[in-house]
Amino acid sequence: MKKLGTDLLKRGFAKMVKHGVVMDVTNVEQAQIAEDAGAAAVMALERVPADIRVQGGVARMSDPEMILEIKDAVSIPVMAKARIGHFVEAQVLESIGVDMVDESEVLTPADEVNHIDKRAFTAPFVCGARNLGEALRRIDEGAAMIRTKGEAGTGNVVEAVKHMRAVNEGIARVVGYKEMGLEAELIQMARNELKVPMELISEVAELKRLPVVNFAAGGIATPADAALMMQMGCDGVFVGSGIFKSGNPATRAKAIVEATYNFDKPDVIGEVSKNLGEAMVGINIDEIPEEKLLAKRGI
């Protein structure tokens, strides 16, 4: 019962930022711009994904002092990233009071086999996923929120679209099997393909969606990108390099918030898309060497 209550509390926090935008920020000034623009939360980190991609090296948890400065400067929730499998980084982030930990493929993985046991923490976690199997495995580990991995730091939404479609197609298969009474196929799918408990599959079949909040992330650079992901069924969006690598961050931040909230209103999206200045310079995915792709980290 205690574990269930903890899961409910963690998922409850994730629902609080539903329909909102979480923005990457690297300092107090950016955090205040994000809050003024209407961000639901900020992600505090020392380097945005675009810089991590260019500069290379080992990307680790940010300096706790920087995270605390941002926490002191804003009234909205503050998230921070830990490396995949690095449970001590997560312990540190929990100890300084971050509102949510992102076990992130954007940072250099600390463990190439295991993710963090998120059920051992009171802080909620968000994790990336490219398909239904990855999403459900992270939820089984205790994740309270899922996001598409996309391909962070590219300004190119194509991978986020691919990952959201894969999750949706997986859910449709589960629902279809359930409606046709194909229980044996569901059991086989859970055991051999998705590698998750049958209870999670049953929950997906009943809800016809993931049992936790599911955000878009990775390559979102424009208001239209945000609205696209929302129309595909996302519950909100993370925007990393797309805001503060653009020509007019404050205006673009507000526009993305408006487009996320009004995702089904093309006239509003068109209006907020006017005169935003230059978007971040994007990268075509096929120009990225295989070993530099971030989304492949952590399955």
UniProtKB/Swiss-Prot annotation:
D-ribose 5-phosphate binds at residues 24, 153, 219, 240-241. The keyword Lyase applies. D-glyceraldehyde 3-phosphate binds at residue 165. Its EC number is 4.3.3.6. Keywords: Lyase, Pyridoxal phosphate, Schiff base. It comes from the Archaea. It catalyses: aldehydo-D-ribose 5-phosphate + D-glyceraldehyde 3-phosphate + L-glutamine = pyridoxal 5'-phosphate + L-glutamate + phosphate + 3 H2O + H(+). It is an enzyme of class 4 (lyase). The active site is at 81 (schiff-base intermediate with d-ribose 5-phosphate). Catalyzes the formation of pyridoxal 5'-phosphate from ribose 5-phosphate (RBP), glyceraldehyde 3-phosphate (G3P) and ammonia. The ammonia is provided by the PdxT subunit. Can also use ribulose 5-phosphate and dihydroxyacetone phosphate as substrates, resulting from enzyme-catalyzed isomerization of RBP and G3P, respectively. In the presence of PdxT, forms a dodecamer of heterodimers. Belongs to the PdxS/SNZ family. This is Pyridoxal 5'-phosphate synthase subunit PdxS. It comes from Methanococcus maripaludis (strain C7 / ATCC BAA-1331).
